[in-house]
Amino acid sequence: MALASSPAQRVIWQDIINFVERHPSNGSHCMKIRKLSLIAIAFLLLPSWVRASLDVELQGLEGEAQQNVATYLAAIAPEERDGSYRFKARVERDVRQALQAVGYYQPKITLNAPEGDTLVVSVNPGPPVNVAQVDVVFSGEAAMDDDFHSLKAKGPQPGHRLNHSDYESLKSQIQSLAVKKGYFDGRFTQARLEVAPDRQQAFIRLHFASGKRYHFGAIDYQGSQIQHKRLDTLRDFSPGDLYQVTDLGEFNQALANTGWFASALVQADMEDAEDNEVPIKVTLTPEARNKFETGVGYSTDIGPRLKLNWRKPWYNSRGHSLSTSLAVSQPEQTLTSTYKVPLDDVSREYYQVQLGLKNTDQRDTTSFEATTSVSRHWLYDTGWQRSVSLRWLYENYSQGQDEDIVSVVLPGVNVTRTRVRGGLMPHWGDKQSLTLEAADPAWLSDISLLRLQGRSAWIRSLNKNHRGLLRVDGGALISEEFREAPPSLRFFAGGDNSIRGYGYETVSPVDDSGQLSGARYMLTGTLEYQYRLGGNWWWAVFADGGDAWTNHLSWKRAAGTGIRWSSPVGPIRLDVAHGFDNDDDDFRVHLTLGPEL
């Protein structure tokens, strides 16, 4: 027996030896036995932290076999890796079981004497066991269900090397599919994996008797403050339809998305199922009648901003809702109230009435706006949203040398789609938006105009550490009465979400007095690359460009670098940018909070 070699072990063994030397046996046979017993007991009582812990080195394996064996051996606790016979037997047993799991039933395993702190295990896996027969049979109504036969086609096939996990996976998938599709009485009449190692053959036998498929029964709403007929439009199934668990999940999500409920739970009531029909229980908890939110924000465009929101998620039993928001900063103050009226298809179609007030005092713009709009919205399964609107705008303004009071009625149409994957800091996403509005004295407007504005933005990633952003914004105001058009309909560029390196809405034509006048046209673009520094922190480098012009396009260029933090409330962006078009251009700092699309 080799003595332990660690410093702690040597100290303990030296204490034992000293004790024995101080108590000589004087030749007594009994005393010799006592000494040997003492040594053995002391070794057994040694704490685990002083015993040697051996590493295991595998030789002769590769691929899936090597990975599976390594996984088995990694489960052996360090205190058990003591080089004992029991440890070696455990290693051999685990290697054999791990190889059997991936189809090797006749391995040759050699455990070499430990070299230092390493036990070398040499393995010849031997010939693999291949699947000779796959006997998968479905009876009952599942026999005519293509989804079950698709599972069989994707499972183990004759000629493939046996893998126990493939067999278990197929068995589990059949059971899971049966539950998802309502074969609640289904069971295996045969479920065996037979292996003949000497012949290197395996036989898979799975016979599943599904019985009859269940149908949806009655829908029982509990705790709802909203009319049941409104909730019915949120589900894509009816009593009597074939049961499908995904229908319940989609219904649950649709209920949650309405904002009417603090919690929603849709589940099959199996205890009351009869005659192959399962009732559906919908348990709902109403959302609070009034919700208040306050917040403080900051951006370099408008400085500090105070926000207050008041929402009534459900105003009445028909599911109408009301929201009012107030935002106050030094250059801008806005008050907006929105009333939403869901239609028969409550999750996809609704009317919206909006009232708004806005006061602006920013550089060469002084404006007071009052707006009223009515809009009709459609949401499609493709992700696109469409709306038509009628908006009345009253604006008392001073823009450079232009001063006026204007009233315009703007019928319009908008199409938009936003797609994201990956939460608040998406690794993939895009946004497309296009808005067209028109005004004419024929429908009580002071001026005639056509206004078009659009955005296209894209986020794409290469693995987890590289991220790119491309964004293009454009607009046009077509009118022979441009100088009568209010500032809110003209175009400006520059700022945190436009051309960084330039001040907020400072890119614009100027009038004879040198003051900003706003533009007929606007086109800006951003190209940005981001690299993950670690965790939720990113480094960014970007180039921005564009212009807002009336007669002559003068492309503005800027570039810079910055830091991104994916915070719990959304991306926070800190950038330093520099313009390249004027001798007096300087570095500008931009700080923003919010989504990039």
Q: Which residue stretches match the model-derived regions?
A:
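N-terminal amphipathic/basic-hydrophobic helices that include classical n-h-c signal peptides
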Residues: 1-30
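Bacterial N-terminal signal peptides that target proteins for export
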Residues: 30-38
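Cleavable N-terminal signal peptides
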Residues: 39-40, 50
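Periplasmic polypeptide-binding modules associated with outer-membrane biogenesis and secretion
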Residues: 52-64, 71-300, 309, 323-341, ...
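Gram-negative/organellar outer-membrane beta-barrel architecture
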Residues: 146, 244-433, 450, 460, ...
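Extracytoplasmic gating/loop element in the C-terminal half of outer-membrane beta-barrel translocons
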Residues: 278, 464-542, 548-550
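Short glycine-rich, acidic/polar surface loops and turns
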Residues: 525-528, 556-564
